[in-house]
């Protein structure tokens, strides 16, 4: 979920060649393709690098895969690399466009790289899409899932449903299920603000809409996470407020967010909690080197934990 796109970030985007048809195995090399997942639908998938585990980058609500290939840093944080190429330097990495998400183009636009889906989507259905995509594209598992914001909910639910295919988790200022009780009576207003964040696409029937409340329930009822290493990265600076969120609601969100982050840390023992000091919600843009380091840490821990 992002409500502002820095001009420098937009200018950094480059066009990517789309390849249709049956994909080759994505065990190495750079690929960018529309993958048939069945039911007359395809999803855009981009992969790079080689090695194991395969890292899967999951974007926040309403966001295409673009943020993982961009940076918006300030000294002393280096300008490059972005998370996607930075992770590709030491292992295989993939990311994809969910239907109805916003591209970081100029001007911003809904992605045309994945088949549109109308109506509100459930978290289990989105996890099913992801699993079908990885299977159809023959992306080698198991996977280290990196989820930003709402992407963290996808990562958690995927790990619950597919523990045998999950190697580790990195949660980047992720939206966790504990945010609901932390916000209490203000939760419904927050979810409504997520549904209508004040973008030019709010009224578009193909704009991504998700049953966030049902997603929280699915995770709460999904049982424990598999015994894999986890890292949590959290912001220290305020959210960029959407025009549809009141100052009072934003203040309550800021007060509740650290409690929900700490709950994520408590989901698995010995989970490192990394504070991206000076960063807002978009840790992967402002602190790509910290995000990459967290991915490498969990990749190393997962390798050490293998029998």
Task: Give the positions of each predicted feature.
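Conserved acidic catalytic loop of the alpha/beta-hydrolase fold
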Residues: 124-142
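Flexible "cap/lid" loop of the alpha/beta hydrolase fold
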Residues: 170-208, 244
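Catalytic active-site module of serine/aspartate enzymes centered on a nucleophile-bearing elbow/loop
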Residues: 269-307
């Amino acid at each position: 979920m992002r409500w502002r796109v820095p001009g420098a970030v937009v200018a950094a985007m480059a066009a990517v060649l789309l390849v249709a048809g049956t994909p080759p195995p994505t065990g190495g090399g750079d690929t960018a393709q529309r993958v048939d997942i069945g039911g007359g639908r395809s999803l855009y998938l981009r992969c790079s690098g080689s090695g194991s585990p395969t890292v899967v980058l999951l974007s926040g609500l309403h966001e295409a895969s673009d943020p993982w290939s961009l940076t918006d840093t300030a000294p002393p944080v280096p300008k490059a690399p972005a998370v996607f190429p930075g992770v590709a330097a030491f292992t295989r990495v993939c990311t994809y466009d969910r239907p109805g998400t916003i591209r970081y183009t100029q001007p911003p636009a809904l992605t045309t790289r994945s088949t549109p889906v109308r109506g509100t989507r459930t978290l289990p259905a989105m996890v099913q899409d992801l699993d079908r995509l990885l299977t159809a594209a023959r992306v080698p598992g198991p996977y280290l899932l990196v989820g930003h914001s709402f992407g963290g909910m996808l990562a958690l639910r995927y790990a619950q449903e597919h523990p045998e295919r999950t190697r580790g988790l990195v949660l980047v200022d992720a939206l966790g299920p504990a945010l609901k009780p932390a916000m209490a009576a203000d939760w419904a207003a927050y979810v409504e603000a997520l549904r209508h964040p004040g973008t030019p696409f709010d009224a578009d029937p193909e704009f991504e809409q998700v049953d966030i409340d049902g997603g929280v329930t699915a995770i709460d009822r999904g049982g424990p996470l598999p015994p894999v290493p986890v890292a949590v990265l959290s912001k220290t600076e305020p959210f960029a407020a959407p025009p549809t969120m009141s100052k009072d609601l934003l203040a309550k969100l800021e007060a509740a967010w650290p409690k929900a982050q700490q709950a994520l840390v408590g989901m698995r023992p010995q989970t490192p909690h990394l504070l991206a000091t000076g960063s807002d919600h978009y840790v992967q843009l402002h602190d790509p080197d910290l995000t990459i380091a967290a991915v490498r840490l969990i990749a190393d821990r997962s390798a050490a934990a293998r029998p």
